[in-house]
Amino acid sequence: MALIPMVVEQTSRGERSYDIYSRLLKERVIFLSGEVEDNMANLIVAQLLFLESENPEKDINLYINSPGGSVTAGMAIYDTMQFIKPDVRTLCVGQACSMGAFLLAGGAAGKRAALPHARVMIHQPLGGFRGQASDIQIHAQEILKIKQTLNERLAFHTGQPFEVIERDTDRDNFMSAEDAKNYGLIDSVLVKR
């Protein structure tokens, strides 16, 4: 298990300690780090909803460093980002690959960014299934529907034609922060605050 730093604050009522992520949550900063999976998605969704209830007018900052992961878990986060009232600013630190890149692009228009040496990668959804031929066919049809949806949403967020997205996600497509900006996945490359 990773060591999580603690922050100690002095108040008029004494000292109070927080883990670093809880302290940053008070500043409306959420970290999406590691593989996108159901437990992580539930935590991110809960934090988004909590921050909306605290102040529905103030932006939320979502920092992303992820190799990607589960499409359904990622879509839970994405749909919540689109559903809540506050704008969600996205910032790639390190990498945003696969579902991580999709969530990066899903931030509020004009408020999506990456640090200069971040890497972004888009591709088609991965899937695998074993079983009876008819069940394999059902799962193949489902993954094609998911691919269609992801490509439609990427086209919407990037401004790229659907056909371009379809071509560019056929295989792993790695981009620098500047390339991701030119492609429309992000709006800016941040060097300094």
Curated annotation (Swiss-Prot):
Q: What is its main location?
A: cytoplasm
Q: Which UniProt keywords apply?
A: Cytoplasm, Hydrolase, Protease, Serine protease
Q: Is the keyword Cytoplasm in the record?
A: yes
Location in the cell: Cytoplasm
Transmembrane residue ranges: none
Alphabetized InterPro entries for the sequence? ClpP (IPR001907), ClpP/crotonase-like_dom_sf (IPR029045), ClpP/TepA (IPR023562), ClpP_His_AS (IPR033135), ClpP_Ser_AS (IPR018215)
For this chain, the annotated S-S bridges are none
Q: Can you cite an annotated GO cellular component?
A: cytoplasm
Q: Where is the active site?
A: 98 (nucleophile), 123
Reactions it catalyzes: Hydrolysis of proteins to small peptides in the presence of ATP and magnesium. alpha-casein is the usual test substrate. In the absence of ATP, only oligopeptides shorter than five residues are hydrolyzed (such as succinyl-Leu-Tyr-|-NHMec, and Leu-Tyr-Leu-|-Tyr-Trp, in which cleavage of the -Tyr-|-Leu- and -Tyr-|-Trp bonds also occurs)
Gene3D superfamilies, per the entry: 2-enoyl-CoA Hydratase, Chain A, domain 1 (3.90.226.10)
This enzyme's EC code(s): 3.4.21.92
One BP term from GO: protein quality control for misfolded or incompletely synthesized proteins
Which top-level enzyme class is recorded in the Swiss-Prot or TrEMBL entry?
Answer: hydrolase
Single GO molecular-function term?
A: serine-type endopeptidase activity
Protein family per UniProt: Belongs to the peptidase S14 family.
Q: Record's PANTHER family?
A: ATP-DEPENDENT CLP PROTEASE PROTEOLYTIC SUBUNIT
User: How is this protein organized at the quaternary level?
Assistant: Fourteen ClpP subunits assemble into 2 heptameric rings which stack back to back to give a disk-like structure with a central cavity, resembling the structure of eukaryotic proteasomes.
Task performed by this protein = Cleaves peptides in various proteins in a process that requires ATP hydrolysis. Has a chymotrypsin-like activity. Plays a major role in the degradation of misfolded proteins.
Q: What is this protein called?
A: ATP-dependent Clp protease proteolytic subunit
